[in-house]
Amino acid sequence: MLSQEAVLSSKLEGTHATLEDLLNYEAGNKVDIERDELHEIINYRKALCYALENITTINDNNSRGLPLSNRIIKEMHKILLNNVRGSSKNPGNFKRTQNYIGSRATIFYTPVPPEQTTEYMSNLEQYMHHDDLDLLVQSAIVHAQFEMIHPFEDGNGRIGRLLIPLFLYYQELLSYPTFYMSSYFESDRSLYISHLSNISKKNNWKDWFKYYLEGVICSAEESTKRHRIS
């Protein structure tokens, strides 16, 4: 299930490798796909495994682990971009140059500038440590805010999607972070981007919450079906 999530999340960023390609590659079989694409997927999986090994949940006072924090997020980013596309774009550190969302011809959103990124990410980190809202709504806010900050020069989408199960695990809504939404986002990528864009353009959180929570239901149903099959 984790490998499938890694494949789907990476597909949103332009990779073409399938789960079958990944499994064949790891079994030592020949595959007709770029090696770097497969390693991007493997790195995604490694980044999540790193987080699982190093974070503790919000009410676990006996663990030596760390809270879900920018320190964890930066290390995940470093692992994600290790020796693959984007490895020259400051892995493990917040952006030093302005980034944009969209194509060169059509920029539809300009994220937070580099000089304000640390401040905004510190605020987001503090927000992740509170539980004053419904946790599913809060996870929708965390994901959207991360994407609007776009703190790294590359790899923001994948890290932002990883934050969803990690946040719910950290807040103890999940006993293990095996809840993934990349399949839902990938099913209509333009709609996903449109809802995120409308938050910044029109402050339209209502439609984002509706879209996101519908995705929670779809993803939960999909996860349940997979567990039954396995």
List the model feature ranges, each with a label.
Residues M1-S230:
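FIC/Doc superfamily catalytic core
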